[in-house]
Design a protein with these regions (language model features):
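ATP/NTP phosphate-donor binding region
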Residues: 1-78
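Active-site histidine-anchored catalytic micro-motif
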Residues: 59-67, 71-135
């Protein structure tokens, strides 16, 4: 198992939505603002991935876009951790796009990052664990 390095001030953190697009909805703007403020107070630099704030319908209908965000985060050497914005029962749909993608698999193995998420993001924890990453 590969254990990612701990975070330090100035590290970039990717924000992904692997299941639901709730974080991009107007009624959650205050939660997004609070999260960004808290991460910045910790000295971290939040990076919202391209699809993370798209509406709920788009996110639900496009698991490949959600998977692309996670792949992009792992391929970016500047990003040191990935935070899932929300859990949800739709995250499992990202797994085929990732586990059949050699670039993603190589990125996880060669660019280990802290990965955190709750609820059904456990599917992604298991996926990363199978690739040798301690989450």
């Amino acid at each position: 198992m590969t254990k990612p390095k701990k975070l330090t001030k100035g590290d970039k953190i990717a924000i992904v939505s692997l299941s639901r697009g709730i974080l991009g909805m107007p009624f959650c703007k205050h939660e997004l603002d609070i999260a960004m403020e808290r991460l910045k107070k910790l000295g971290l630099i939040p990076v919202i991935m391209p699809n993370a704030l798209k509406d709920m319908d788009y996110i639900q209908k496009n698991p490949e876009a959600r998977a692309s965000d996670l792949k992009q985060a792992f391929m970016d050497d500047e990003i040191k951790a990935v935070i899932c914005a929300i859990g949800g029962d739709d995250t499992y749909k990202t797994i085929p796009y990732l586990m059949e993608d050699k670039e993603f698999i190589d990125a996880v193995k060669n660019h280990p990052k802290i990965f955190t998420g709750f609820s059904d993001s456990t599917n992604n924890h298991l996926m990363l664990n199978k690739l040798g990453l301690s989450t």
